[in-house]
Amino acid sequence: AAELKNTLGLAGDEAGGLAMIAQTTGRSIDDVTASIVDTTSAFNSANRSAISQGQIIRDVAKASDGVKASLGGNDVAIAKAATAARRLGMELSQVDSIASSLMDFESSIEAELEAQLLTGKNINMSKARELALNNDLAGLGKELFKNSASLAEFGKMNRIQKEAQAKALGMTRDQLGKI
């Protein structure tokens, strides 16, 4: 763990988290780190993004026990979810919270219908709810990105429309504004 702190600039708890993932998967820390870097690079290439590999290593290392358990302790799955979260301008824990809010089906569907009525935009969150139900946080991140308003659209909305759009996505207005 001390080597990770020096080499990757990780905090003590982050280095410990990465070491635990390596131990759980039966792989070396170097293998785990390399797979996280490869996963981030592949995501960046596929999505024309520039998400920091170091940030994703830190995000994977500090993923909550609940997220790790939901994703089977798989470093690649956690890295995919973390990159999808960062693409949204969020941390993995925030996407996990959104997944939880989408599981309140009645409220989620009500918010979706309200947003459609107020914005005139077709919003379909059924796939997002399915992904949340199946603990697919990477897929959920992509689905949230797909259903978010573009910056131009978001800028034209009034405050009530912005709040409704964000609520339908399980987010706050500020979170939606970051996308």
Describe these PLM feature segments.
Residues 1-178:
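Amphipathic alpha-helical assembly segments
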